[in-house]
């Protein structure tokens, strides 16, 4: 039953705001990508990496220029500046459980 639910629900998008030359951003990448790709079920989370320095991302530059790296799911910030790896795992597990519960309830 759980496998069927996991195979049928949509991906959860993590927006990862970053910029070139940011050492904290590089450290965050070394934590978040393995967490999502190796430690959670395949394709349950996707990472949308957003370079705030690009011309078309000016609204993010204005908002996060002094705060990168920033990770968000929906409107919730799950990390800013430095990643607490334990908190990241806790947040991702909590969000995944909530999504599974929601999808299961919608199917019933």
Curated annotation (Swiss-Prot):
PANTHER family from the UniProt entry: GLUTAREDOXIN-LIKE PROTEIN C5ORF63 HOMOLOG (PTHR33558:SF1)
Pfam families recorded: Glrx-like
Record keyword Electron transport present: yes
Protein origin, superkingdom: Eukaryota
The UniProt record lists the keyword Transport: yes
Disulphide bonds in the chain: 22-25
Keywords (A to Z) from UniProt: Disulfide bond, Electron transport, Transport
Protein name, UniProt field: Glutaredoxin-like protein YDR286C homolog
Family: Belongs to the glutaredoxin family. YDR286C subfamily.
